[in-house]
Amino acid sequence: MLNKLSRLLEQAGISLTDHQKNQLVAYVDMLNKWNKAYNLTSVRDPNEMLIRHILDSIVVAPHLRGERFIDVGTGPGLPGIPLSIVRPECHFTLLDSLGKRVRFLRQVQHELKLENIEPVQSRVEAFPSEPPFDGVISRAFASLNDMVSWCKHLPAQDGRFYALKGLVPDDEIAQLPEGYSVESIAKLQVPQLEGERHLVVIKPNHF
């Protein structure tokens, strides 16, 4: 699996250390093992996990600005765990309301010795925002409108929302709450992944 990951990274033009590659493979191994009992993801094939979970997450890294991020509705740690591995200088709070997912995240944190993550079991509306975050990240969490409405207390004044989407969600963009606008839309290149992937970056208009 390490060779497969190395080929995918090369195709994506991403350079990682051997330690980072080993951490990503170890995470996939854990996800595959726990998935059999806890049903954490619908992807059953570890090689598919490399494409649809690992690469699909880390291609976002160059677009993130800041040092403190929160991954809302992280599930089994996506995209937060892969991002924390490739951006070790940043801190990621991983938020999910389901206990089984957070237990898995804590086990990953322990086994991979990830000191820059904090798994938290909470609903996003109930989670305090002190201190505020540089970025709020979501992948398959909610519509843009719901994401901004539920998470508006989390980012700093000049913070951003980062939403991973498939096709550009024009209908969701049109329904953004007042006071927010799209700063950029980046087409993400994920090797061997069928379908389009985009990162929508949303900013508050006061900044």
Swiss-Prot record:
Molecular function terms from GO: rRNA (guanine-N7-)-methyltransferase activity
Entry EC no(s): 2.1.1.170
Gene Ontology CC annotations of this record: cytosol
Alphabetically ordered keywords of this record: Cytoplasm, Methyltransferase, rRNA processing, S-adenosyl-L-methionine, Transferase
Superkingdom of origin organism: Bacteria
Reactions performed catalytically: guanosine(527) in 16S rRNA + S-adenosyl-L-methionine = N(7)-methylguanosine(527) in 16S rRNA + S-adenosyl-L-homocysteine
Subcellular locations according to the entry: Cytoplasm
Pfam assignment, any one: GidB
Entry binding sites for S-adenosyl-L-methionine: G73, L78, V124, E125, R139
Entry's family note: Belongs to the methyltransferase superfamily. RNA methyltransferase RsmG family.
Its job: Specifically methylates the N7 position of guanine in position 527 of 16S rRNA.
Protein name: Ribosomal RNA small subunit methyltransferase G
UniProt source species: Enterobacter sp. (strain 638)
Gene: rsmG
